[in-house]
Amino acid sequence: MAENAYSKAGVDVDAGYQVVERIKKHVARTERMGAMGALGSFGGMFDLSSLNLKEPVLVSGTDGVGTKLLLAIEADKHDTIGIDCVAMCVNDILAQGAEPLFFLDYIATGKTDPVKMEQIVKGVADGCEQAGAALIGGETAEMPDMYGADDYDLAGFTVGAVEKKKLITEGAVKAGDTLIGIPSSGIHSNGYSLVRKIFFKDNDFKLNEAFTELDVPLVEELLKPTRIYVKPVLEVLKAVDVHGITHVTGGGFVENLPRMLTNDLAVKVELGSWPVLPIFDLMKKYGQLSELEMYEIFNMGIGMVLAVAKEDVEKTLEVLVQNGEAAYVIGEVTTRSDDAVIFGGAKG
């Protein structure tokens, strides 16, 4: 009787049970040492003693995917958006030197579609596998009075750990350090309100628009999942003393690079030292944006930046290449006299 009354209120309990059954196989493949408990427990559990850290510091992060979700909904493609959610969280805690341990997701929707929910969680599990994190819990909330039937929101939460003496904070970066950039896959998960405005409001392009500059239709380019840098960067952290790490997200270079600096330091970024992806040139063209504006908003083809001592540059590049990464020397840290970010050859 209670179930029937709940159904009349617009909440499909049976669909929720179907989701749990469908996602079990995806959750199972994210298991790692330290993860405890089973799917359906009230709380997710992790055994920190499995890490063998002398002074463990826990580092947590939470994030969502923003309005990139609207493109996934419109294109009816939901199997990679979960990777974005994981990436936004784990890349952030990686910037402190932390290894992601576990992840939890939260999906809110107007109507529970078990197939769609499975696709979303599959993406989350894919991201967790890439990051080496266990998917130890989550929540799917059906709220018909809050969301349209096809709408959903996705958020994630991660916790990682690092040995206290290896925790990366802004005080470690020094003048003379070299900046090494690791490529992005594209826009990643920031700036999509502007992206959608440029392509679909200010210009009447279609989702499947073909641009000669792109090797895939527009929507495929825009939905390319955010790269997860955990495994290659953790290998670098084992090999050299990394002074600072920046995850280039919302606010682009201008807002994010200073986050690893003290107030007396600046970074000089040499434009042209890495290939800018074609999607950014298209947005600059059709959005009529200046070059500086682009670097204030987007990652411009670099998703993560490491600051290392000059004597560690060669080893850092070597480790990244050994782990399948392209990497570029993109600038240096200097003493600050004015702006925190200086662009060599920047155009207005």
Curated annotation (Swiss-Prot):
Output the InterPro entries linked to this UniProt entry.
PurM-like_C_dom (IPR010918), PurM-like_C_sf (IPR036676), PurM-like_N (IPR016188), PurM-like_N_sf (IPR036921), PurM_cligase (IPR004733)
The family database entries (Pfam families) matched by this protein are listed as: AIRS, AIRS_C
Question: What SUPFAM superfamilies does this protein's entry cite?
Answer: PurM C-terminal domain-like, PurM N-terminal domain-like
Q: What is its EC number?
A: 6.3.3.1
Q: Any idea where this protein resides?
A: Cytoplasm
Pathway(s) it belongs to: Purine metabolism; IMP biosynthesis via de novo pathway; 5-amino-1-(5-phospho-D-ribosyl)imidazole from N(2)-formyl-N(1)-(5-phospho-D-ribosyl)glycinamide: step 2/2
From the UniProt record, list the coiled-coil ranges: none
Q: What is this protein called?
A: Phosphoribosylformylglycinamidine cyclo-ligase
Chief place where the protein resides: cytoplasm
Record keywords:
ATP-binding, Cytoplasm, Ligase, Nucleotide-binding, Purine biosynthesis
Example GO molecular function term?
phosphoribosylformylglycinamidine cyclo-ligase activity
- Gene3D superfamilies, sorted: PurM-like C-terminal domain (3.90.650.10), PurM-like, N-terminal domain (3.30.1330.10)
Among the record's GO biological process terms, what is one? 'de novo' IMP biosynthetic process
Listed GO cellular component terms?
Answer: cytosol
Family as reported in the entry's similarity comment = Belongs to the AIR synthase family.
Q: What is this enzyme's catalytic activity, as reactions? A: 2-formamido-N(1)-(5-O-phospho-beta-D-ribosyl)acetamidine + ATP = 5-amino-1-(5-phospho-beta-D-ribosyl)imidazole + ADP + phosphate + H(+)
In terms of CDD domains, this protein maps to:
PurM
